[in-house]
UniProtKB/Swiss-Prot annotation:
Protein name: Rhamnosyl O-methyltransferase
An example molecular function term from Gene Ontology annotations: methyltransferase activity
Alphabetized PANTHER family for the sequence: RHAMNOSYL O-METHYLTRANSFERASE
Entry keywords, A to Z: Lipid biosynthesis, Lipid metabolism, Methyltransferase, Signal, Transferase
Source species: Mycobacterium tuberculosis (strain ATCC 25618 / H37Rv)
Length: 245
């Protein structure tokens, strides 16, 4: 009798497991959330300042966590020798990039530029593979420094723009990088989500509009990495994942 009971119990358990499996499959098959769901989450994440509460190794890192995951995947595939960051702030993202690059295991340097390092975390300053430069990112001297680093660390480049978000400044940054980036290099223009794309409507022309203006002038410079941009449903860099042609 005990053996029969255990057999029936086992069969019931298997049936319940099968029903759950079918229900799970059906949910995945028939539930197709609209883009509006992702947009609402985007607005929630931004509007509640979740991005300002994000840290890396205890250092503030004002980023979308899904974007950061995307960046490490890009770095792993691209295997650049030079990472360029315009906009240092606390230094968390620069340290993050350096740690990822060390795992890739080839000689590299991270150059991060900001017009003020007053907010820079002292722990970030101890990072040996990051070069912190206090300057406007559009100063011609920055282009000269990038060229020197290219000579010292030949190979692919990953660049990310996250400093002054005004259209004219971002456009100037993109133009400064134009002669420095080669085919296959990667550029991310962050915060193109502001000015109603979909957050902070009324901000005024910003990174999104800078990308459009750049592409009007130089339509063949970049192709858009739509797969990366859309991978996690939303990004702080819409229209801003760019691969140099």
């Amino acid at each position: 009798m005990g053996l029969v009971w255990r057999s029936r119990t086992s069969l019931v358990g298997q049936l319940i497991g099968l029903v759950r499996l079918v229900a799970s499959f059906a949910a995945q098959l028939f539930y197709r959330p609209s883009d509006a769901v992702a947009e609402e989450y985007h607005k929630w994440y931004y509007g509640n300042l979740v991005w300002t509460k994000t840290t890396y190794m205890g250092i503030n890192c004002w980023k979308s966590v899904s974007d950061m995951w995307n960046y490490q995947e890009i770095l792993s595939e691209l295997q650049p020798s030079l990472v360029i960051e315009f906009g240092t702030r606390y230094g968390g993202s620069a340290v993050y990039f350096a740690n990822i690059m060390r795992q890739i295991g080839q000689p590299f340097k991270v150059l991060t530029v900001d017009n003020s390092h007053k907010a820079l975390d002292p722990r970030a300053r101890r990072e040996p593979d990051v070069l912190f430069v206090e300057s406007s990112s559009t100063d011609p001297a920055i282009a000269e420094q990038i060229q020197r680093l290219k000579n010292e660390y030949p190979g692919k480049i990953f660049a990310i723009l996250d400093s002054d978000h005004s259209m004219n400044h971002v456009l100037a940054e993109m133009k400064l990088l134009r002669p420095l980036l080669s085919a296959g290099d990667y550029l991310v223009v962050e915060d193109s989500n502001i000015n109603g794309h979909p957050v902070l409507p009324g901000f005024g022309p910003g990174p999104y509009e800078a990308i459009e203006a750049y592409e009007d002038e130089f339509p063949n410079d970049y192709k858009h990495d739509a797969e990366r941009e859309n991978k996690f449903g939303w990004t702080s860099a819409p229209n801003g994942f760019l691969i140099r042609n």
